[in-house]
C-alpha cells in the first residue's frame, strides 16, 4: 500500500496539469511556430519555465486505484497486476478468465 502522501501528491499533480493545460499548450504553440520572432519564442520559453514543474503531464504517474501501487499498472483496469489477479480469481472482472493451454 502506498503512503497517503504519495497518493495526495499524485492528485495534486493531476490538478495542476489540468489547471495549466491551456497555458502550456499556448506557450508550446508559440515556441514551435516558425513564423514567430526569435524574441517571442524566447519569451515563451522563459514563461514556460516559470510554470510549476508539476504542471507538466509527463510528471504524472499512473497508480492503482485500490492500493496506490505505481508499478505494474494496467491501464485497461486502472489497477495493479496484483489487484487485477485477485479480482479475476474472484470473478469480479467480466469476460476475464485465467489462461490455460
Curated annotation (Swiss-Prot):
Pfam families associated with the record: Ribosomal_S14
Keyword vocabulary terms for this entry: Ribonucleoprotein, Ribosomal protein, RNA-binding, rRNA-binding
PROSITE patterns (UniProt xref): RIBOSOMAL_S14
GO CC annotations on file: cytoplasm; small ribosomal subunit
GO molecular function: rRNA binding; structural constituent of ribosome
GO terms under biological process: translation
SUPFAM superfamilies referenced in this protein's UniProt entry, alphabetically: Glucocorticoid receptor-like (DNA-binding domain)
Residue ranges of the TM segments: none
Ribonucleoprotein among keywords: yes
Role this protein plays: Binds 16S rRNA, required for the assembly of 30S particles and may also be responsible for determining the conformation of the 16S rRNA at the A site.
Entry similarity comment: Belongs to the universal ribosomal protein uS14 family.
Protein name: Small ribosomal subunit protein uS14
Organism in which the protein naturally occurs: Salmonella paratyphi A (strain AKU_12601)
Amino acid at each position: 500500500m502506498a503512503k497517503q502522501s504519495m497518493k495526495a501528491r499524485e492528485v495534486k499533480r493531476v490538478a495542476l496539469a489540468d489547471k495549466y493545460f491551456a497555458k502550456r499548450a499556448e506557450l508550446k504553440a508559440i515556441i514551435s511556430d516558425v513564423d514567430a520572432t526569435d524574441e517571442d519564442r524566447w519569451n515563451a520559453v522563459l514563461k514556460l519555465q516559470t510554470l510549476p514543474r508539476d504542471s507538466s503531464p509527463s510528471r504524472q504517474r499512473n497508480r492503482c486505484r485500490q492500493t496506490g501501487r505505481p508499478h505494474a499498472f494496467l491501464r485497461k483496469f486502472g489497477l495493479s497486476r496484483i489487484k487485477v489477479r485477485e479480482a479475476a480469481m474472484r470473478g469480479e472482472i467480466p469476460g476475464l478468465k485465467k489462461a490455460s493451454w
